[in-house]
């Protein structure tokens, strides 16, 4: 298990690489703001800890080992992409120098903090618990890498300081500091601030390190969302102030706990669930409900544009199986995307025409004027459909009534449901008589991995952003996960007026959507970086005409 890789650690690795390789030195007199921190036990220790049996067996699969190999190589290529441009090929010698270090970040225990100075000035302090042999190897490899970049390696510039060495380029303010304290190797990148370094050394020598004990968690992450927004100068005000998540083993499963601290107060009073069971046709592979989360829901992309008058106080979402068996043979047909969401509305708000008009304004004339798109509505039938060629998905919104309540419903595949086959009563029973419950999500994770992998590939095809196909080890990895991952349940519970408690029990610590997003991200040429325009520019690709 020494080479095993824990999927939730990808977030921690990004945090490490982002600050470790992209920091710029700031003035020592500038105040630092904590942006995030982590504590990871390392796969070597996790393999000896209780629980997570499904995850541990998954990590021994050949497809998982291939993904780990790909991950380590991409992380080792990250510095060159940062310094010389995203998408450029990394220097093979520098990649070879860093690959064992990236593998050690997965295998050994580490703690780190990222601080912001003034955008884009960052400071990373990281400590990793290594054997003497490994500390020597890191010393040699990091010296070689700095020298290969043309950085000057020299003794500490601070008099009386206990670092082994420092390195900096000749023409910029970047600074790297390397030192040792007992079993821990300490590295800082960025601003020349010594306080944190000396505090950590003191804590290590007094056996009080790491400074934030995690009580047996395999991985702990804390992100200061509000501080990140202020640091980056982002105009929008985040709905979330702080998030902390902890992962640990629990029998066959991974237990995920934590909290979300919101900027606005959460309403204590709740209405009873309003669920139109005649629309939710069994079988389903996922079922979600939310209520009284308007401060969070309104921060999602497009929500305020589509719901200018009022954000729905509650909603129910579900999806049906995407795998479709061809009745004429064993081969499967193209997957269906039977994903739906519905929410109650007042009688005078049941018309979907306002949503249709807002969608036009949000999507823009250039998108809707494309010859492959047609947004049409029927006021009498109270529905609107976006017809896209080819027609794998046909997003729609419609209004309807169930009993005395009026609803609106949206989905990716327009369907007229005329029969009643409600989901199991036990599933609906999970959300009843639970006054603190604000969000509930159940899924068959393997089925959802299949669904989202194909949905993301469809998006890549329609918008010319590429697809993750069978020649990628990540494709084989997600196919393997389809057959290994079962039930997952996530809950958000109101703890106090500004805190939501996170609870999840799953096989991998992640939902199918999260797994598919991470696989798609790792597949990108620029991983672990993010190419901003690829997330903001959405134009339908021109399809090539078939050859005669």
Q: What does each model-identified segment do?
A:
Residues 1-13:
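Positively charged n-region of N-terminal signal peptides that target proteins for export
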Residues 161-187, 371-412, 538-548:
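Short, intrinsically disordered low-complexity segments
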Residues 29-166, 170-171, 214-237, 255-372, ...:
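Structural boundary/hinge residues at secondary-structure and domain interfaces
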Residues 12-24:
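Bacterial N-terminal signal peptides
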Residues 413-538, 542, 547:
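Long, C-terminal catalytic modules of enzymes
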Residues 103-112, 173-178, 237-251, 311-323, ...:
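Broad, structure-driven detector of short, well-ordered beta-strand segments within folded domains
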Residues 125, 129, 188-191, 343-344, ...:
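Extracellular/lumenal glycan-associated surfaces
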Residues 172-235, 392-474:
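A conserved glycine-rich beta-strand in the N-terminal activation segment of trypsin-fold
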């Amino acid at each position: 298990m020494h080479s095993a890789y824990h999927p939730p650690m990808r977030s921690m690795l990004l945090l490490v690489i982002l600050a470790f390789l992209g920091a710029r030195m700031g003035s020592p007199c500038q105040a630092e703001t904590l942006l995030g921190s982590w504590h990871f036990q390392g796969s070597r220790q996790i393999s000896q800890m209780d629980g997570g049996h499904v995850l541990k067996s998954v990590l021994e699969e050949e497809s998982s080992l291939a993904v780990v190999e790909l991950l380590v190589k991409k992380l080792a290529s990250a510095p060159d992409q940062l310094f010389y441009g995203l998408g450029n090929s990394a220097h093979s010698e520098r990649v070879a120098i860093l690959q064992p270090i990236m593998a050690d970040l997965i295998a050994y225990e580490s703690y780190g903090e990222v601080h912001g100075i003034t955008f884009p000035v960052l400071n990373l302090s990281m400590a990793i618990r290594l054997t003497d042999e490994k500390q020597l190897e890191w010393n040699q490899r990091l010296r070689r890498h700095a020298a290969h970049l043309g950085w000057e390696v020299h003794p500490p510039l601070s008099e009386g300081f206990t670092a082994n060495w420092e390195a900096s380029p000749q023409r910029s303010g970047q600074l790297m500091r390397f030192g040792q304290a007992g079993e821990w190797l300490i590295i800082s990148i960025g601003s020349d601030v010594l306080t944190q370094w000396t505090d950590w050394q003191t804590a290590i020598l007094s056996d009080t390190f790491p400074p934030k004990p995690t009580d047996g968690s395999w991985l702990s992450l804390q992100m200061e969302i509000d501080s990140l927004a202020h640091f980056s100068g982002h105009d929008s005000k985040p709905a979330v102030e702080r998030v902390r998540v902890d992962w640990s083993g629990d029998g066959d499963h991974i237990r995920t706990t934590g909290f979300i601290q919101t900027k606005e107060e959460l309403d204590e009073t709740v209405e009873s669930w309003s669920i139109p069971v005649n629309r939710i046709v069994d079988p389903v592979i996922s079922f979600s409900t939310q209520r009284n989360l308007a401060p969070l829901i309104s921060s999602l992309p497009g929500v305020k544009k589509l719901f200018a008058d009022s954000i729905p106080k509650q909603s129910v979402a579900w999806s049906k199986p995407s795998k479709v068996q061809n009745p004429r043979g064993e081969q499967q047909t193209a997957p269906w995307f039977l994903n739906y969401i519905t929410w109650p509305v007042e009688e005078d708000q049941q018309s979907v025409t306002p949503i249709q008009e807002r969608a036009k304004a949000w999507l823009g004339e250039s998108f809707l004027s494309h010859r492959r798109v047609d947004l049409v509505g029927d006021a009498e039938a109270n529905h609107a459909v976006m017809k896209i060629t080819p027609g794998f998905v046909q997003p729609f919104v419609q209004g309807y009534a169930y009993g005395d309540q009026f609803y609106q419903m949206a989905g990716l595949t327009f369907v007229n449901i005329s029969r009643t086959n409600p989901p199991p009563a036990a599933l609906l029973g999970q959300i009843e008589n639970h006054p603190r419950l604000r969000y509930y999500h159940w899924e068959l994770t393997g089925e959802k991995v299949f669904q989202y992998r194909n949905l993301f590939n469809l998006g890549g095809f329609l918008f010319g952003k590429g697809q993750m196909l069978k020649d990628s080890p990540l494709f084989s990895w997600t196919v393997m996960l389809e057959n290994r991952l079962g039930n997952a349940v996530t809950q958000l519970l109101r703890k106090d007026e500004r805190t939501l408690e996170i609870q999840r029990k799953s096989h991998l610590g992640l939902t199918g959507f999260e797994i598919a997003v991470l696989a798609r991200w790792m597949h990108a040429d620029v991983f672990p970086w993010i190419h901003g325009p690829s997330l903001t520019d959405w134009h339908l690709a021109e399809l090539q005409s078939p050859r005669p």
